[in-house]
C-alpha cells in the first residue's frame, strides 16, 4: 500500500471498539444501518452501538461521515459527528449527499448537483442494494472519483458472492445464495427484494437477536420456509 493509497475496509463492531484504544477513526466513515448483532458478545444494544461509534469517535473537522438517512438510529448520530456529515436515501431527497429522483441517482455535494441516470438498469434487487450503491457512490466521490465514472461502474456491477448472488436457473426456478445475511434484518432485506413469494432455506448460530420481525417477513414474503442449524427451533 502506497502512502497516498486509498484503502476500503469493512470493520466489525469488535474492530471498531479497538479503534477507540488507538484513538483513530477513518477519514471517510460510512454507516449503512444499525440493527441488533453480536449481542451474545456485547450483552445489549447500548454496548453494541457504543462499539459502532468508534468509527466516528476520533474524526476531525477535516473528515467525513456518510450516514443512511433511512435509518432512524443513524439520523440521531448527526449531533455526535465531528466530521462533515453527508446523507444518502433511497426514499427522499437529502440536503447534501446522494438520493433518488425518478430513474436517476442524484449526487448533491459542495453546491453541485448531478443526475446519474439508469437506476432501472441496476442489476442488484432490493431497496437495500440501492442504499448500498448510494453510500458507495458518495464515498467514491469524496475519495476523488468522477461522477460519470461512478455511473458507469454502477451499471456494470453484478454483485458479490454470497450476497443475493444469482446461482442458476433450473426448470424456470431461480436460485439465489444470500448466506452472508447473518442477522434477521439482513435476511428480511433479502427476501423483501423479490416480487414473488420465495422458498427460503434459513438458519445458523444464535447471536442473541430476536426473530419476531423475521418470522413476520417470512409470512409475508415466503411460500415455504426450511429451517436448519442451531436456531431452527427458535
Give the label of every model feature segment.
Residues 69-73, 90-93, 230-233:
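Short, polar loop motifs at secondary-structure junctions
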Residues 82-100, 151-155, 165, 227-228:
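Beta-strand->loop->alpha-helix junctions that form or flank phosphate-binding loops
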Residues 2-88, 99-101, 106, 117-124:
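Flexible active-site lid/hinge loop adjacent to a nucleotide/diphosphate
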Residues 1, 5, 231-234:
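Short, intrinsically disordered, charge-balanced linker/junction segments flanking boundaries
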Residues 2-6, 24-27, 61-62, 81-83, ...:
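Short coil/turn connectors at secondary-structure junctions
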Residues 117-223:
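Nucleotide phosphate-binding/pyrophosphate-handling subdomain across enzymes
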